[in-house]
Amino acid sequence: MTIVRKTHPIMKMVNHAFIDLPAPSNISGWWNFGSLLGLCLIIQIASGLFLAMHYTPDTLTAFSSVTHICRDVNYGWLIRYMHANGASLFFICLYLHIGRGIYYGSYSYMETWNIGILLLFRTMATAFMGYVLPWGQMSFWGATVITNLLSAIPYIGTDLVEWIWGGFSVDKATLNRFFAFHFILPFIIAAMAMVHLLFLHETGSNNPLGIPSDCDKIPFHPYYTTKDFLGIVLLLAFFFTLVLFFPDLLGDPDNYSPANPLSTPPHIKPEWYFLFAYAILRSIPNKMGGVIALILSILILALFPHIQTGKQRSLMFRPISQFLFWLLVSDVLVLTWIGGQPVEPPFIIIGQIASVLYFTFILAFLPIAGLNENKMLKW
C-alpha cells in the first residue's frame, strides 16, 4: 500500500518539509523559534483579518472604530489585544531567532540568512504601518517623525515624503495607503517565509556544535514536532497571560488619546521593539547621518558571513567570543532602554556610547576575538 503523503503532489511537499525531513539529532530549544514565528504570523493574519472587518481607515472615524471594536464587537477587545500583543510576541521571537543565528553561526547559510534579513525589514515596515492605524496621538506623531526621516535624502527627500503622505502632512490619504499596505504585507511575508524554508532545506539545519550532521540525522516527525508543540504551548501560555492580565503593558498610554496635529506629545517614540534602532538614530546629531546609522543598524546583519574569522562556526567552545556576544546583547538592551528615555543628559551620552559600541562589537571586537581564538587553538 502506498503512503499518500509520499505520493500525493501537495502532501509530498508537506512531507518533505515537516514529516520526513532529516534533522540533526542534537538541535536544542533555540531552534523552536522558527516554528513559533510561523505561529505568530498565523495569529497576526487571523486576528488582523477580523479587525479589518470592523476598522475604517479614515482620520475622522479610525479612532472611534477601534473603540467600537473594543466595546461593541463580540470579543473585539480580545481580538484587538491579541493583535497588538501578538506583534510584540512576534518581535521577541524574531530577535531570539536572530540571536540564535549569530551565536551558532547559522549566517553561514548565505541565501537563508539574507532572505531572513529581508523578512526582518518587511516585518518592521508592516509593524510600523500597523502602529499608525489606531490613529492615537503616538500613532500620528510616530508616523510624522519616522516618515519625515526620508526628507534627509538629497534632492528628492521632500518630494518623496509628500508623495508617501499623499499631501503636505500625515492625513487621510496616508492612513488609507498604510492600511492597504499593512493588509497585504503579511501575505508577502508568509510567501517569503516559504522561500526562507526552501533555502534552509537545501542545506539542512545547523546544530549547536556547528559541525556537519549528515551522519546523524533523525526524522522531523515525531521528534521535533513534539518539541515544537511544547514550545507552542509555552508561548501561548505566556501570550494569553499578557493579553488577559497585562494587555497594555507594552503599549503607549498616549495612544488612548485621539490624534491631534495641534498638540505634540512630550516624548515621541516608536513601539518598544524599534527603540534600539531609534536610540542609534537619535545618538547622531546630523539628520542624514542618523538615518544612515538607523538603516545600517539592521543591514549590518548582512555582514556577519563576511566578517566571520573564527575557524569554528559556533560560539559554543569560544569563550572570548561568547563573552563579547553577551556584551552585544546587553548593549542592545541598553539601547532599547535609552530609546524610551527623553533626549536629555545623561541619556544622550549613554546612547552615543552604546551606539558606538554596537557597531564596534560587530565590526571589530568579534572578528579580532575569532582570530585570537584561532591562534590559541593553533589553527
From Swiss-Prot:
Note the SS bond partners.
Answer: none
Sites binding heme b b566 sit at 97, 196
Q: Which PROSITE patterns match?
A: CYTB_CTER (PS51003), CYTB_NTER (PS51002)
Listed Gene3D superfamilies: Cytochrome Bc1 Complex, Chain C
Q: Does the UniProt entry include the keyword Nucleotidyltransferase?
A: no
Spell out the subcellular localization from the entry: Mitochondrion inner membrane
Q: Which Pfam family is an annotated match for this chain, by its short name?
A: Cytochrom_B_C
Cofactor(s) the protein needs: heme b
Positions with a binding annotation for heme b b562: 83, 182
Major localization listed first in the record, in broad terms: mitochondrion
Per the record, its GO cellular-component terms are: mitochondrial inner membrane; respiratory chain complex III
Q: What residues bind a ubiquinone, as annotated?
A: 201
One example GO MF annotation: metal ion binding
Quote the cofactor binding remark: Binds 2 heme b groups non-covalently.
Instruction: Cite the PANTHER family for this sequence.
Output: CYTOCHROME B
- Please describe what this protein does: Component of the ubiquinol-cytochrome c reductase complex (complex III or cytochrome b-c1 complex) that is part of the mitochondrial respiratory chain. The b-c1 complex mediates electron transfer from ubiquinol to cytochrome c. Contributes to the generation of a proton gradient across the mitochondrial membrane that is then used for ATP synthesis.
Q: What else does UniProt say about it?
A: Heme 1 (or BL or b562) is low-potential and absorbs at about 562 nm, and heme 2 (or BH or b566) is high-potential and absorbs at about 566 nm.
Instruction: Give the record's subunit note.
Output: The cytochrome bc1 complex contains 11 subunits: 3 respiratory subunits (MT-CYB, CYC1 and UQCRFS1), 2 core proteins (UQCRC1 and UQCRC2) and 6 low-molecular weight proteins (UQCRH/QCR6, UQCRB/QCR7, UQCRQ/QCR8, UQCR10/QCR9, UQCR11/QCR10 and a cleavage product of UQCRFS1). This cytochrome bc1 complex then forms a dimer.
Protein name according to UniProt: Cytochrome b
According to its UniProt entry, this protein's organism is: Dipodomys ordii
Q: What is the lineage of its organism?
A: Eukaryota, Metazoa, Chordata, Craniata, Vertebrata
